[in-house]
């Protein structure tokens, strides 16, 4: 039967353990009795060694029973118990060290040669005990049967090991076995009688069998497996495994803490543990386990208090498992623990001690969790679990560093031990369990089983057992062959694994961040235990143990044991056990990791913990029983860990120990988690691990807040948290983070620029902000050229004592980056070429791919979190929302992450089990934004955001996204109508390779969306060579950050001209805006292209005016709105009449020419002229807006080509006329026109300037209009007086800044217009999007037209549908929507992002749009004619209503207003206008639209 086979594999360990554990089955009682007799013989031999190990009193049994429940709770609360457990572990380790000292030589030789004999003696003793136990209950009988099978095998293995081991184990174990067995039989009878009836008892019985199998060499190799797949391996008792798990997990905690304390407190408790190991012969069992059988005795027991502690732990756990008085005893260890106990007791007293350890709360926890994990298939999980365990036990940083050091030490020690022990004993000797290893197959398997039992039964036992388990695991790892030989050994190892997994689970909780590293460590460890991996599967144990058995002979090398003694007795034992479990665990664990994600986390911890875990487990179980005492252990733990690490071949094990030890340190040092790579801060025992002792420094300097990042050893010179913020000269504030401000500062020592991110603590209820902790832990693990580098942490206190006065603040010190992408796009100071966009995206996706491969989700990718320096280097920043991602884990995450504009549809629909695809969607939004200069999806509500996404990417439906129906909000957030995917049409203006990538990144179905790695292989990015890319021409005189951009936008809105910072910025925007404003008015009429063209000048005006309009009073805005509304009735002839153009046939011709020019894509100039025309029209009541629109388009063309003077004149005329029409609005316009008119001279009728401008550039307009324009807008005969009055009022109302901005706009557009025209033609192709790009983002618009264009863009996108009037209405809606967006900080131009804004979206803003505006939209022609200024004013008003906030929004609003006039035009114009807008980029000061 598989269990007996495993038992046989365990021979030594399983025989004794089975005697104790098997009592449950009646059939097995005879076999178990026979084996018990054998065990007793072995125990007699071992008793000599066992006596040295420590005397275990029968009391241990009762304690064990008490401890069992404790063990369960310990599993649950291993985190909190980690620290208190250390004390108990120290004691155990000391005992173990003592035992090691006495038993090292014996164990080494006996371990290899006499382990079989020992196991036989132990088996005999345990069989005797088993018989007694069987008498107690049928459960005990069944367990004994399992034990007997294991004892038989263990006897065989013992023979292989050597008679020396047998003699030791038998002598010691017999004495202990007799006592313990008697007590155990009594307890087991009591407990098992209750358990027998339950199915749990059967499961446990089966579990004991599996444990027995594991106890032997098999167990060792398997014990890692066993931890997770005890029951699976024990095919006989899946339920048994689950029982062990269940019990381990809950009750043992409470019991563990109390029992563990008692163990710690009294030597009697240690003796109890010992007695527990053998059923009731604790002394013999303890001695044997201490000397040879238990990895503890070899590795950590040598003379370490561990041996005593563990013996007490064994006693408790033995009493627990034997008597099973407590429900935990029944569930967990009645049958499984009994088998474990009997196995470990009868084969080797040392295993008993291990058992007691396993019984100890921590240990039992481990065993139960392991068995559960085994059941679930935690083999794959194991690797994950061990890393997780480490984090749970201690602070992530400390444990990680410790683990690293210990791993290194373990690797070195493993080599040394391997040489000494010929490979197999390497691990055991390291853990001072080499003697135990000699008895290893039988004793260790028994111990492991016992350890598992004890873990379940009592935390204290767990502590003791963990060392044994670790040693066994290490033995199995070191002696992969030995493990194969000894199936029983593997099973014990598995038990250890189970225990380790329990420990690791809590650790995992603690050190979530450390988990990745720990997982790596566990993976590293996993390779050494490959033989164990073979043995881990339930069937494998039988098969694989034989291969491992041959290595057992090498186990004897005594030198390994001597190494162990240096380890601090308490911690070494524990760490050794952990190490063993880790070593064994890795093979099985890795397979299990996939199966059990959470368990996998714990198991990797166990593996990593193998070194650290010993301390961790010791710390955890002890913590459970007595939290305070274990705290002192951490210092010892490091040494022990180091010792363990040298003994343990797998370097990851030492890391675990380091982690275990460091946990306490970690409590003091938050940043320590990244230290994981560093190694144990205090590894005195392991000089080799010390080699990796950056953590040592933290130990030396405990006040350290942060340890250097793994790759930053050099920076250890100035320890994190050691410096004060006064070492920096703060230059200014550059941002506002989630938990404080961000400052630009200069290091006084080095002179380098840094960014200081302030973490304020005064308002923190929880102490240090969790987001800051998470960011620190994650950033210390991410070292990449495209990820921002955190240099150190400083405080605002000179002395640590100052924190008593007030909490103060911490500062995270980052490398300084000159700009962020949002600030640059919104500034309008930069125009990115296709190559620049390629470079940015390549760097961004490389950084994201790195994060995803490290299993981190960023969860907040947006333009303001993408930093650039002046050399064009991009870095991903702000990891405050980032978190570790486990693909095997099914736990939900919050979906309230990622800024709304960049949030993917699955999060909007309520997905909580998302993948890294969420970050790819955000990067796709940024790719579109780089081309369009504005966010492509700008909504202020989740429903509106989903609507925008649906309009561009199609509605989410099962046809394209099969799993969408499973999402919580799929039915509640369905769009009002179904949309088809229009992304390729909307973005047809971008290169095809970029379009393909954008299409793939913005796929609705996250499972079909490309990964970050795939984006790097796309045609757009695969051939990009960053080294050959020319850096973009970034503004070196101005750092463009989000905060600066927002301030600038607010100033623009408030009317304060921000020309000074970069005058070029203001002038560019203004110029462009002026141009766009006029075209917008034109666009309002029928021709969409002219609308766009007009939008550009109008927007420019709006922006030039934009600043003015921002400055306009509400009354002025209202006047503008009224004018625009009244203009709806205007026709082209009416407009001409109003403008006095009707009298001139040339004007009519010009109007026709304007229409042609509109067709010719001369939107920019025509828009400007139109706005001029509109001004006169407005003064004339804007009756002929339609006419004006066409002429203005024509004029716009001419104006674009016309000289800057013409542009200025036209703008001035438009402004003056607008002012005339409405004195409030007119006053603003007057101011502009005055400034413009100064150069222009007389303000002729706007018609004249328009005609001139149109005629000059296109040469279509009659020269009449053109000449008046350059000198100044000649006032039309009727309008001039009005214009003058308006102008006079306007200058008064307008700020000088506004006038200056207008002038700049005029001058700049002049230069820009020619370029605009060609661009316009190009833009025509993309139409909506092309228009959109310029106005796309307020900050995105490089040129003024774009700024003004944002509103237009919105309109144009609507016009994309090509509905002129509906477009105008939608434009109004968009406008309103954009206004609301600007509230959000988006620019209306942002909203303008053409296709993004749809009627539904507009509805949101629509409410905000004044009715007049709507009417204006209804009357696009009037608007167009109504003078761009009035339109701009009206739009500005709208945006103000919408609280566009940014001045750019106002400007863009005006531009949009024009667009409203001609939505249909807007689409045509959009294309036209788009080109010019791009040229205007310099002027495209982003129209100050709110981001």
Curated annotation (Swiss-Prot):
GO biological process, one term: mRNA processing
EC code: 2.7.11.22, 2.7.11.23
Main location: nucleus
Keywords noted in UniProt: ATP-binding, Isopeptide bond, Kinase, mRNA processing, mRNA splicing, Nucleotide-binding, Nucleus, Phosphoprotein, Serine/threonine-protein kinase, Transferase, Ubl conjugation
Residues reported in the UniProt entry to bind ATP: 734-742, 757, 815-820, 1041
Ranges where the Protein kinase domain occurs: 728-1021
Class of enzymatic activity (EC top level): transferase
Linked residues for Glycyl lysine isopeptide (Lys-Gly) (interchain with G-Cter in SUMO2): 264, 510, 656
Compositional bias of kind Basic residues: 34-49, 107-119, 197-206, 367-382
Record field: compositional bias (Acidic residues): 72-84
Residues bearing the modification Phosphoserine: 237, 250, 266, 275, 277, 302, 304, 311, 313, 319, 324, 326, 333-335, 339, 342, 344, 346, 384, 386, 401, 421, 424, 615, 645, 682, 686, 890, 1054, 1084
Cross-referenced Gene3D superfamilies: Phosphorylase Kinase, domain 1, Transferase(Phosphotransferase) domain 1
Sequence positions bearing Phosphotyrosine: 73
Sequence ranges of Low complexity compositional bias: 288-306, 314-351, 578-598, 1191-1204, 1474-1491
The protein, known as: Cyclin-dependent kinase 12
Gene source species: Ailuropoda melanoleuca (Giant panda)
């Amino acid at each position: 039967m598989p269990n007996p086979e495993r038992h046989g594999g365990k021979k030594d360990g399983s025989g004794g353990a089975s005697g104790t554990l098997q009592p449950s089955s009646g059939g097995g009682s005879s076999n178990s009795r026979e084996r018990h007799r054998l065990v007793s013989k072995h125990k007699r031999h071992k008793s000599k060694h066992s006596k040295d190990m420590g005397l275990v009193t029968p009391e241990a049994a009762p304690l064990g029973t008490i401890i069992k429940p404790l063990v369960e709770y310990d599993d649950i609360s291993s985190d909190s118990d980690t620290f208190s457990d250390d004390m108990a572990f120290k004691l155990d380790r000391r005992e173990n060290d003592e035992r090691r000292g006495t038993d090292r030589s014996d164990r080494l030789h006996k371990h290899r040669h006499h382990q079989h004999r020992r196991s036989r003696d132990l088996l005999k003793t345990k069989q005797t005990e088993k018989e007694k136990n069987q008498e107690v209950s049928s459960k005990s009988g069944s367990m004994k049967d399992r034990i007997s099978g294991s004892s038989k095998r263990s006897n065989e293995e013992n023979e292989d090991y050597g008679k020396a081991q047998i003699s030791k184990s038998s002598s010691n174990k017999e004495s202990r076995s007799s006592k313990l067995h008697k007590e155990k039989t009594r307890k087991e009878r009591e407990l098992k009688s209750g358990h027998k009836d339950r199915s749990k008892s059967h499961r446990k019985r089966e579990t004991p069998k599996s444990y027995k199998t594991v106890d032997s060499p098999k167990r060792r190799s398997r014990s890692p497996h066993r931890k997770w797949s005890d029951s699976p391996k024990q095919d006989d008792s899946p339920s048994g495994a689950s029982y062990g798990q269940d019990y381990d997990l809950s009750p043992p905690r409470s019991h563990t803490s109390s029992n563990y304390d008692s163990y710690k407190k009294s030597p009697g408790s240690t003796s109890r543990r010992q007695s527990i190991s053998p059923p009731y012969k604790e002394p013999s069992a303890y001695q044997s386990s201490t000397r040879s059988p238990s990895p503890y005795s070899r590795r950590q027991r040598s003379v370490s208090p561990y041996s005593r502690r563990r013996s007490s732990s064994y006693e408790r756990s033995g009493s627990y498992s034997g008597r099973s008085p407590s429900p935990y005893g029944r569930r967990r260890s009645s049958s499984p623990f009994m088998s474990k106990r009997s196995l470990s007791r009868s084969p080797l007293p040392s295993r008993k001690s291990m058992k007691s350890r396993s019984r100890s709360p921590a240990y039992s926890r481990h065993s139960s969790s392991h068995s559960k994990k085994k059941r679930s298939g935690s083999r794959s999980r194991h690797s994950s679990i061990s890393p997780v365990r480490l984090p749970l036990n201690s602070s992530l940083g400390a444990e990680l560093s410790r683990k690293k050091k210990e791993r290194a030490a373990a690797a070195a020690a493993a080599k040394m031990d391997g040489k000494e022990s010929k490979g197999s004993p390497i691990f055991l000797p390291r853990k001072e369990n080499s003697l135990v290893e000699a008895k290893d197959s039988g004793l260790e398997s028994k111990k492991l089983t016992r350890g598992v039992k004890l873990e379940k039964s009592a935390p204290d036992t767990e502590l003791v057992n963990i060392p044994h388990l670790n040693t066994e695991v290490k033995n199995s790892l070191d002696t992969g062959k030995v493990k194969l030989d000894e199936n029983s050994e593997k099973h014990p190892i598995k038990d250890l694994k189970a225990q380790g997994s329990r420990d690791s689970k809590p650790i995992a909780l603690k050190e979530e961040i450390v988990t990745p590293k720990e997982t790596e460590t566990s993976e590293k460890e996993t390779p050494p235990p490959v033989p164990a991996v073979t043995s881990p599967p339930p069937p494998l144990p039988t098969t694989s143990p034989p291969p491992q058995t041959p290595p057992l002979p090498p186990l004897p090398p005594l030198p390994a044991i001597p190494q162990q003694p240096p380890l601090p007795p308490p911690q070494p034992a524990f760490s050794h056990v952990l190490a063993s479990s880790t070593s064994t665990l890795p093979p099985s664990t890795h397979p299990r990791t996939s199966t059990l994600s959470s368990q996998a986390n714990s198991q990797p911890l166990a593996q990593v913990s193998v070194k650290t875990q010993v301390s961790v487990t010791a710390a955890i179980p002890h913590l459970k029983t007595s939290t305070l005492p274990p705290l002192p252990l951490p210092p010892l733990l490091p040494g022990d860990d180091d010792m363990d690490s040298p003994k343990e071949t797998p370097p990851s094990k030492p890391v675990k120990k380091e982690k275990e030890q460091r946990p306490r340190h970690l409590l003091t040092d938050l940043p320590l988690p990244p230290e994981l790579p560093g190694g144990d801060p205090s590894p005195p025992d392991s000089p080799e691990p010390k080699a990796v002792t950056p953590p040592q420094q933290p130990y030396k300097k405990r006040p350290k807040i942060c340890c250097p990042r793994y790759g930053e050893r050099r920076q250890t010179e100035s320890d994190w948290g050691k410096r004060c913020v006064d070492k920096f000269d703060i230059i200014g504030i550059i941002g506002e983070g989630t938990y404080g401000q961000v400052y630009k500062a200069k290091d006084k020592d080095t002179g380098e620029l840094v960014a200081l991110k302030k973490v304020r603590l005064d308002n923190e209820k929880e102490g240090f902000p969790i987001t800051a902790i998470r960011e620190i832990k994650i950033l210390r693990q991410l070292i990449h050229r495209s990820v921002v580098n955190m240099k150190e942490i400083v405080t605002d206190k000179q002395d640590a004592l100052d924190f008593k006065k007030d909490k103060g603040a911490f500062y995270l010190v980052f490398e300084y980056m000159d700009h962020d992408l949002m600030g640059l796009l919104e500034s309008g100071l930069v125009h990115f070429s296709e190559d620049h966009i390629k470079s940015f995206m390549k760097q961004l996706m490389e950084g994201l791919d790195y994060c995803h491969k490290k299993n981190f989700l960023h969860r907040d990718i947006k333009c303001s979190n993408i930093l650039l320096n002046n050399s064009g280097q991009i870095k991903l920043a702000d990891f405050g929302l980032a978190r570790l991602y486990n693909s095997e884990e099914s736990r939900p995450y919050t979906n309230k992450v990622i800024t709304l504009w960049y949030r993917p549809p699955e999060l909007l629909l309520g997905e909580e089990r998302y993948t890294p695809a969420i970050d790819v969607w955000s990067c796709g939004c940024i790719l579109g934004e780089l081309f369009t200069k504005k966010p492509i999806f700008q909504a202020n509500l989740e429903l509106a955001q989903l609507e925008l996404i649906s309009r561009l990417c199609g509605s989410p439906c099962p046809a394209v996204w099969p799993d969408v129906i499973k999402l919580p909000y799929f039915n509640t957030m369905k769009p009002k109508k179904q949309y088809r995917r229009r992304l390729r049409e909307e973005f047809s203006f971008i290169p095809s390779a970029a379009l393909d990538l954008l299409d793939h990144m913005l796929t609705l179905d996250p499972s079909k969306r490309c990964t970050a790695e795939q984006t790097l292989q796309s045609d757009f990015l695969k051939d990009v060579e960053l080294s050959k890319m020319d850096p973009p021409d970034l503004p070196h005189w101005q750092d463009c950050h989000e905060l600066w951009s927002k301030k600038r936008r607010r100033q623009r809105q408030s009317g304060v001209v921000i020309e000074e910072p970069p005058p070029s910025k203001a002038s560019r925007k203004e110029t462009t805006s002026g141009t766009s404003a006029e075209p917008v008015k034109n666009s309002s009429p029928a021709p969409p292209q002219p609308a766009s063209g007009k939008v550009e000048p109008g927007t420019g005006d709006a922006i030039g005016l934009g600043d003015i309009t921002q400055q306009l009073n509400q009354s002025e805005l209202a006047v503008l709105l009224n004018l625009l509304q009244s203009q709806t009735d205007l026709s082209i002839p009416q407009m001409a009449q109003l403008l006095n153009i009707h009298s001139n046939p040339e004007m009519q011709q010009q109007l026709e020419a304007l229409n042609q020019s509109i067709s010719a894509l001369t939107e920019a100039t025509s828009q400007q002229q139109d706005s001029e025309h509109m001004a006169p029209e407005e003064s004339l009541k804007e009756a002929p807006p339609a006419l004006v629109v066409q002429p203005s388009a024509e004029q716009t063309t001419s104006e674009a080509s016309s000289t800057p003077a013409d542009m200025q004149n036209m703008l001035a005329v438009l402004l003056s006329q607008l002012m005339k029409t409405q004195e409030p609005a007119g006053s603003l316009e007057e101011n502009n026109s005055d400034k413009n008119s100064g150069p222009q001279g007389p303000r002729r009728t706007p018609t004249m300037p328009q005609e001139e401008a149109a005629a000059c550039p296109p040469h279509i307009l009659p020269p009449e209009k053109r000449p008046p324009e350059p000198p100044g807008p000649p006032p039309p005969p009727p309008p001039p007086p009005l214009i003058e009055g308006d102008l006079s009022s306007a200058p008064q109302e307008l700020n000088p800044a506004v006038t200056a901005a207008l002038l700049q706009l005029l001058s700049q557009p002049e230069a820009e217009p020619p370029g605009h025209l060609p661009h316009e033609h190009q833009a025509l192709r993309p139409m909506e999007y092309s228009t959109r790009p310029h106005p796309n983002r307020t900050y995105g618009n490089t040129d003024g037209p774009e700024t003004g264009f944002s509103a237009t863009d919105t309109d144009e996108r609507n016009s994309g549908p090509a509905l002129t009037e509906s477009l105008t209405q939608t434009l109004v809606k968009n406008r309103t929507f954009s206004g609301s967006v600007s509230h959000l900080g988006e620019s209306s131009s942002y909203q303008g992002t053409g296709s993004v804004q749809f009627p539904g979206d507009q509805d949101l803003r629509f409410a905000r749009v004044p009715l007049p505006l709507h009417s204006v939209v209804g009357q696009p022609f009037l608007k167009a004619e109504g003078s761009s200024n009035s339109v701009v004013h009206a739009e500005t008003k709208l945006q103000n209503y919408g609280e566009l906030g940014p001045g750019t929004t106002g400007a863009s609003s005006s531009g949009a207003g024009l667009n409203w006039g001609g939505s249909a035009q807007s689409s045509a114009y959009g294309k036209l206008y788009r080109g010019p807008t791009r040229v205007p980029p310099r002027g495209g000061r982003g129209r100050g639209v709110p981001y």
